[in-house]
Design a protein with these regions (language model features):
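Short, small-residue-biased leader/transition segments that mark boundaries at the very start
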Residues: 1-6
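Short gly/pro/ser/thr-enriched loop/turn and capping motifs at secondary-structure boundaries
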Residues: 13-18, 53-54, 77-81, 96, ...
Length: 197
C-alpha cells in the first residue's frame, strides 16, 4: 500500500513472487541490475531476517546514499545490530504486518514513483541479453572476464560436455519452459548468483 519496493536474497528467494510489481529482484554482489540500482539510492533499508553478508551488501559498497539508515528486523540479536542499524528483535511476519499497518495509517508513500518500473524494464532487457549469449570460438568474452586461461577452460568444457551452451542461456530456457511452480535447486559456485539475477 505504501509502494515500498522489495528485494530478495538467495535464502529468501521465495518470500515474494518475482512477478510482484514491487519486487526488484536480488540485491548485492550476486544480485541484479534493478535492485542494485535502487540500493545505491536507498535512504532506508529494511532488512528482514538477513545477516547482511558481504554478498548482500557487496562488502558494504552497494548502499551509497550518504544518509542511508538500516532497520534490521531479525530474531537474531547479533544480526539485528549489523550495519549500525536500528535493531528490531521480532518475528518477520508480525513486524512487517505492524509496519505495513503503521505506514497505511500515516498515509506515507515511498518516493520511488516510476523509477521502479524504469529499473525493472532495464533489468528485463539485461536478462534477455544474457539469455541470448552464444559462445563463439573466436570472439566470445564471458560476463566475468577474469584471470582464467579461457581457451583451456573452453576446450575442457567442450570435451567434457560436448556442448557450447552458456550457463545463462540454459537458465533462460529453463525459465521460459518450466511451469511457474517449479523449483530449481543449486549448489555453490556461479550458478546460485546467476539464478538470483
Amino acid at each position: 500500500s505504501s509502494d515500498v519496493c522489495s528485494s530478495d536474497l538467495q535464502a529468501g528467494k521465495g518470500t515474494v513472487v518475482s512477478s510482484h510489481p514491487l519486487n526488484v529482484g536480488g540485491v548485492g554482489e550476486t544480485g541484479c541490475l534493478a535492485a542494485n540500482l535502487l540500493a545505491k539510492e536507498a535512504d532506508l533499508v529494511i532488512g528482514v531476517g538477513t545477516r547482511f553478508s558481504d554478498f548482500t551488501t557487496a562488502s558494504k559498497w552497494i548502499f551509497q546514499h550518504p544518509e542511508v539508515r538500516f532497520l534490521n528486523i531479525n530474531v537474531s540479536n547479533f544480526d539485528a545490530w549489523k550495519l549500525d542499524g536500528i535493531a528490531m528483535l521480532a518475528d518477520a511476519r508480525e513486524a512487517m504486518t505492524a509496519l505495513d499497518a503503521a505506514l497505511a495509517d500515516s498515509g506515507w508513500q515511498a518516493g520511488w514513483g516510476a523509477q521502479i518500473e524504469s529499473v525493472q524494464s532495464r533489468q528485463l532487457k539485461e536478462t534477455q541479453r544474457v539469455y541470448q549469449a552464444v559462445w563463439q570460438e573466436k570472439s566470445f568474452v564471458p560476463e566475468i572476464d577474469d584471470h582464467l586461461d579461457r581457451e583451456s577452460v573452453y576446450r575442457e568444457f567442450r570435451q567434457i560436455t560436448d556442448s557450447t551452451l552458456t550457463q545463462s542461456s540454459v537458465l533462460g530456457v529453463l525459465n521460459e519452459t518450466l511451469p511457474a511452480e517449479a523449483v530449481i535447486v543449486a549448489a555453490a559456485g556461479s550458478l546460485p548468483g546467476d539464478l538470483q539475477r
